[in-house]
Amino acid sequence: MRIEKCYFCSGPIYPGHGMMFVRNDCKVFRFCKSKCHKNFKKKRNPRKVRWTKAFRKAAGKELTVDNSFEFEKRRNEPVKYQRELWNKTIDAMKRVEEIKQKRQAKFIMNRLKKNKELQKVQDVKEVKQNIHLIRAPLAGKGKQLEDKMVQKLQEDVDMEDVS
């Protein structure tokens, strides 16, 4: 069973699903749903349509360069069936999928970390600009009042010592 890729959105196309468009020069385009086919007919660029894999990779939102993608390459050479080879291949596929998921999760966390740092810098900048909105007008008065009280007490103590 061969799972094809959609020409427009790079989504998986399972056997018996999707549609195929064959151009006059025998170039085959496969589409997973009518939405992709319509966008292709409108000559839209997949890298500019925000919901496609091509956009996400071009914008740096998804992992693009990784060794684990080498395993997804299409191989058209028929190989003689051997049960051992088949079992090893399936085990390797599972392992590769685990590794790929870990790397993608790490990539996403790094992306989010950068955004958090930028957000902190913006928050600090905004607070500094609008500090007058945060500070109450009488916020410093309490300390001044306390200082005056201390001075009066000291003066009273000094006056008693003199008398």
From Swiss-Prot:
Statement: the UniProt record of this protein carries the keyword Nucleotide-binding: no
Annotated Gene Ontology cellular component terms: nucleolus
Descriptive protein name: Probable ribosome biogenesis protein RLP24
CDD domains found in the cross-reference section: Ribosomal_L24e_L24
Organism: Bos taurus (Bovine)
Subunit structure: Associated with nucleolar and cytoplasmic pre-60S particles. At the end of biogenesis it dissociates from cytoplasmic pre-60S particles and is likely to be exchanged for its ribosomal homolog, RPL24.
A single GO molecular function term of this UniProt record: structural constituent of ribosome
Domain of life where this protein originates: Eukaryota
Membership in a protein family: Belongs to the eukaryotic ribosomal protein eL24 family.
Entry's localization field: Nucleus, Nucleolus
Biological process, per Gene Ontology: ribosomal large subunit biogenesis
Keyword terms of this UniProt record: Nucleus, Ribosome biogenesis
PANTHER family documented for this protein: 60S RIBOSOMAL PROTEIN L24 (PTHR10792), RIBOSOME BIOGENESIS PROTEIN RLP24-RELATED (PTHR10792:SF53)
Function per UniProt: Involved in the biogenesis of the 60S ribosomal subunit. Ensures the docking of GTPBP4/NOG1 to pre-60S particles.
Keyword Nucleus attributed: yes
